[in-house]
Amino acid sequence: MAPVLLIGLDPSKIPGFDPAPVELAIAMGHKRFVDAGIDVDTCLVAIDAAARAIIAEALQAKPYGVVVVGGGIRKPDDLVELFEDVIALIRRHAPQAAIAFNTNPVTSLDAAQRRMR
């Protein structure tokens, strides 16, 4: 089974935000992949100028079968440009990968499995 890449915002880099609950959910979601025997990598970025380059580098690390884009990037209206750029980066650097969207970090495995079918 091809590896999966999870792309999201680094909760510890969001000003005025308590990262603990999201970090716990990310860890729980990662454990679900491990328990399912699926190779998974995580790319968490800050909302800054380096985000796109970091994501592009992560996308080129392996031939990912699925890339899951987290809600932190996808949902806020003020991040729509970043979301569009992430989709373009996936298409450019991992054209073989299916694109999936989770509802929260714990559902990332479910999202990836929907696209693995």
Regions found by a protein language model. Name each.
Residues 82-117:
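Ser/Thr/Gly-rich flexible loops in soluble cytosolic domains mediating phosphotransfer, phosphorylation
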Residues 13-25:
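Glycine- and acidic-residue-enriched helix-capping/strand-helix junction motifs
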Residues 52-57, 112-115:
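Distinct, well-ordered alpha-helical segments
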Residues 41-50, 101-104:
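Short beta->alpha junction loops
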Residues 28-39:
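Short helix-loop-beta junction
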Residues 11-13, 46, 72-76:
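Short histidine/acidic/glycine/proline-rich micro-motifs that form metal-
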Residues 55-91:
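Mid-chain, well-packed structural core segment of small domains
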Residues 1-15:
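N-terminal, charge-rich interaction modules
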